[in-house]
Each structure stands twice: as C-alpha cells, then as structure tokens.
C-alpha cells in the first residue's frame, strides 16, 4: 500500500468519524493542518481540469445571486475565484485551516478580484463569523460541520457541497446523508448536480422558522 492510498483511507476514516461525532475533530485538526501545509506548494499542479466542474454546475442553481459568500476549505483559492467570477457583485471570503494554503491562495489572486475576495485562517468547526453573515456557504471536498454552517448562513440563503471525484473523493459525504443532516437544521429545496467526475448538492435555508 503506497502513501497516496494510505492518505485516501485516512481521509475517508476522518470524514466518517467527524461527521458522526464532530467532537472528534479536535483529535484530527493538528495533523490535518500539517498535511495540507505540506502539500500547499504543489497543490495547484495536482488539480485536474474538471476539478471545479461540480461546483460550477451547482453555482448555476443559486438564486438570487448572493452578495456575501463563504468558501470553506478554500485551499489555494480556486473555488473562491470561480465564485467571484460567477457572481460579480459578491464579496467572497475563502477560509481554510492551513496557513500555507492561504499563502498560495493570496499569491494566485488576480488583481481584478482583489477588492472582492479575501482569505482568512479559520477552523470550520468554530467559525469566527456572526450568525446569518453569508448568503451562500460553499464546500469542496470538505468535512462538513453542519451546526456551524447552519448558524452562519442567512435565512433564505444557500449551502453547496461539491465533491470533485464523486464517491471516489477521499473526503466524501453521500447526498442522502447531507440531506438528512441539513433537513434537521431547517434546510429545504434540495438540488443535485453531476459534472465532470463529481457531484454536488445545493440546499436553501428556510426563510422563516
């Protein structure tokens, strides 16, 4: 078994454990930051041409156009840049646990997007944002922390989960599990998308309780 295979198995194990028991994240947080810091300099070279396809397909279903967007697990910022290009009036925050990933994201940010996109270090299990701050929260290949997502999304706002390799993505949560967790937290109007090798799920938070 090579290191890549071991890494994928560990990612899947971590995802399954944390989705079921979010408090376990504290056991994985430090090593996760270390892993992504280590690969940050070469992360962009590892991306495949269709990496953003599921995300971009699902973004077409977001209505109305959001004004404030949070991209969790932004990494080197490719998704945040795509979101800013899709919604030219939106302010986009790309948040990530890895300082080195964020450094790469800042270096890759085009000047024409610099006034609308910023990158911040944040732990998705304890986000430093007020309740209802964002109209859209996106995740790509990211362990979801459902309570925090539900807290920071505004009423009537949307959440988007994209997995670039579908069920083969190391960090993956099946659509039926996403629906179950989101319904419990007041989300509705689910829509599924398939593009490239992956899939995405979009849902809207109820405007009223």
Task: Give the role of each language-model region.
Residues 2-63, 123, 160-181:
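Conserved class I S-adenosyl-L-methionine
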Residues 62-63, 86, 153:
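A generic alpha-to-beta junction signature in SAM-dependent methyltransferases
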Residues 70-72, 76-126:
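Class I SAM-dependent methyltransferase SAM/SAH-binding core
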Residues 125-137:
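A short acidic, Gly/Pro-enriched loop at the edge of an enzyme's catalytic core
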Residues 135-147:
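A short SAM/SAH-binding and catalytic strip from SAM-dependent methyltransferases
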Residues 146-158:
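A short glycine-rich, Lys/Arg-flanked "PGG" loop and its adjoining helix->strand segment in the class I
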Residues 194-209:
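Core SAM-dependent methyltransferase catalytic element
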């Amino acid at each position: 078994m090579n290191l890549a295979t071991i890494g994928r198995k560990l990612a899947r194990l971590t995802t399954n454990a944390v989705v079921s028991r979010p408090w376990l994240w504290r056991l994985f947080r430090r090593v996760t930051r270390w892993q992504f810091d280590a690969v940050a300099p070469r992360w962009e070279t590892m991306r495949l041409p269709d990496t953003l396809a599921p995300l971009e397909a699902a973004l077409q279903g977001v209505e109305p156009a959001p004004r404030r967007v949070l991209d969790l697990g932004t990494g080197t910022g490719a998704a945040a840049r795509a979101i800013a290009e899709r919604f030219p009036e939106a302010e986009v925050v790309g948040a990530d646990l890895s300082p080195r990933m964020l450094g790469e994201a800042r270096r890759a940010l085009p000047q024409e997007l610099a006034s609308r996109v910023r990158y911040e270090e944040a732990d998705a299990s304890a986000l430093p944002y007020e309740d209802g701050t964002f109209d859209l929260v996106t995740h790509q290949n990211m362990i979801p922390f459902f309570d925090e997502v539900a807290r920071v999304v505004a009423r009537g706002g949307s959440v988007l989960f994209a997995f670039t390799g579908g069920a083969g993505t190391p960090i993956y949560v099946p659509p039926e599990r996403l629906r179950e967790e989101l319904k419990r937290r007041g989300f509705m109007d689910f829509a599924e998308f398939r593009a490239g090798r992956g899939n995405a799920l979009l849902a809207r938070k109820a405007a009223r309780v």
